[in-house]
From Swiss-Prot:
Gene3D superfamilies: Ribosomal protein L25, beta domain, Ribosomal Protein L25, Chain P
Ribonucleoprotein in keyword set: yes
A cellular component term, taken from the record's GO annotations: cytosolic large ribosomal subunit
Swiss-Prot/TrEMBL GO biological process terms: translation
CDD domains registered for this protein in UniProt: Ribosomal_L25_TL5_CTC
This protein's name: Large ribosomal subunit protein bL25
Recorded GO MF terms: 5S rRNA binding; structural constituent of ribosome
Length: 213
């Protein structure tokens, strides 16, 4: 199930280009564009505070939003954003316009559960995450919030592949030519070996020294 949707208010921009974008930022707003669904791109300006908290709140690129552009509501999916390299504030956002049959490629986070039920991890093994996110192709209105990997019963040396993940209907991995690995349970150099019984062999007693006569 996807994140809850939300709404943003925006103003249409008549001017585009670097000069116009700088002017928008000077006025405390963030320039953005809405494109796709066989319609011309629409340049807009968003309130800085609203978009800042959405970007840094998590799940921004996997959550459908509604943008109210001067009273006209447009359903969108955030596709990209740029942050200032020094101050980390948003400087531009791209939105994909969502139509009735829109399908998208989107990176979905991977969550792991039941580490305490993994014999391998209990023995000191380490969960080695190969992919923190997996790219999926799916309907825009059915983007998973995350996918879940259950570690119950996993042992050292085990690999978890995409085929082991139960996916919602209509959600397919973009990589389709192989059963790729998402994580492994690896041994740790600090692992304690299983206890083994050791038998101490007593040193033979020295033969008595013969007394000189």
């Amino acid at each position: 199930m996807s994140h809850d949707t939300y709404e943003l208010k925006a103003e249409a921009r008549e001017q585009v280009g670097k000069g116009s974008a700088r002017a928008v930022r000077r006025n405390g707003k963030v320039p953005a564009v809405i494109y796709g669904d066989k319609q011309p791109p629409l340049a807009i300006a968003l309130t800085y505070k609203d978009i800042y908290y959405k970007i840094h709140g998590g799940g921004f690129l996997t959550t459908i939003a509604t943008i109210d552009v001067d009273g006209k509501k447009i359903q969108v999916l955030p596709k990209d954003f740029q942050l200032d390299p020094v101050k980390d504030f948003p400087v531009h956002v791209d939105f994909l316009r969502i139509g009735k049959d829109t399908e998208v490629n989107v990176d979905v986070p991977v969550h792991f559960i039941n580490e305490d039920k993994s014999p391998g991890i209990k023995r000191g093994g380490v969960l080695n995450i190969v992919r923190h996110e997996v790219e999926f192709h799916c309907p825009a209105n059915a983007i998973p919030e995350f996918i879940t990997i259950d570690l119950t019963g996993t042992n050292i040396g085990d690999s978890i592949h995409i085929s082991a993940v139960q996916l919602p209907a209509g959600v397919k991995p973009v990589i389709s030519d192989r059963d790729f690995t998402i994580a492994t349970i690896a041994g740790s150099s600090a692992m304690k070996p299983e206890a083994e019984e050791t038998v101490e062999v007593a040193a033979p007693e020295a033969a008595p020294v013969a007394e000189e006569k």
